[in-house]
Amino acid sequence: MNLEQIYKDCGAYLEGHFLLSSGKHSQFYLQSAKVLEDPKLAAKLCDELAKIITSYKIEFDSICSPALGGILAGYELARACSKRFIFTERVNKEMTLRRGFEVKKSEKFIICEDIITTGGSALESAKIIESLGGIVVGFAALANRGFCAVENLKSPRKDNAKLPENLPLFTLGNFEFEIYDETNCPLCKKGSKAIKPGSRGN
């Protein structure tokens, strides 16, 4: 499966000057919503991701995703794995679990995102699950932006990674994009202004 080509074919592989959710800047952005708007393609991708997770014999009960980006990927992965699905969301900048969702004591979760960059949002969701008595046994995403170690791809962990080193991350592919702090962003130095994805129709 050529994940990069899938993103390009869907118009989801964007080039410009982007402000990422992590606060970093990048010349490239992956707009997974453009990939996941096709239900058949979303099912195909998450069926493949489910096969990878199953092959590692990870035992889990449910899947949780951070809103908003992770919801479609997480729901489709839950469908493919025949598991329960819940999501966390930000309220006043704090990640929370709402909408009547509950976590059972010792319930095992995989945290699923559409894209993992440093893993900050996924880690916030994991901490919510654990604070409610759940157990996080791994992480999953359609793609990794090259910072977190990926179990099935045997890719190394980089300094920016926030996901726990003792838990596996499973993805369909790696996208190796440079990301920058605002202070050393070459695009900023050229006079370009970073755009938050979604703010101008992207």
Curated annotation (Swiss-Prot):
Sites where the protein binds orotate = T117, R145
Enzyme Commission number, as recorded: 2.4.2.10
Mind telling me what this protein is named?
Answer: Orotate phosphoribosyltransferase
Q: How does it assemble?
A: Homodimer.
Q: Write out the coiled-coil annotation as residue ranges.
A: none
Say yes or no: keyword Hydrolase present.
no
Instruction: Show the InterPro entries listed in the entry.
Output: OPRT (IPR023031), Orotate_PRibTrfase_bac (IPR006273), PRibTrfase_dom (IPR000836), PRTase-like (IPR029057)
Q: Which organism is it from?
A: Campylobacter jejuni (strain RM1221)
> What would be an example GO MF term here?
orotate phosphoribosyltransferase activity
Summarizing the function annotation, the protein's role is: Catalyzes the transfer of a ribosyl phosphate group from 5-phosphoribose 1-diphosphate to orotate, leading to the formation of orotidine monophosphate (OMP).
Please name the PROSITE patterns in this protein's record.
PUR_PYR_PR_TRANSFER
Q: What is the lineage of its organism?
A: Bacteria, Pseudomonadati, Campylobacterota, Epsilonproteobacteria, Campylobacterales
Gene3D superfamilies, per the entry: 3.40.50.2020
Q: Entry's HAMAP family?
A: PyrE (MF_01208)
Which CDD domains does the UniProt entry name for this protein? PRTases_typeI
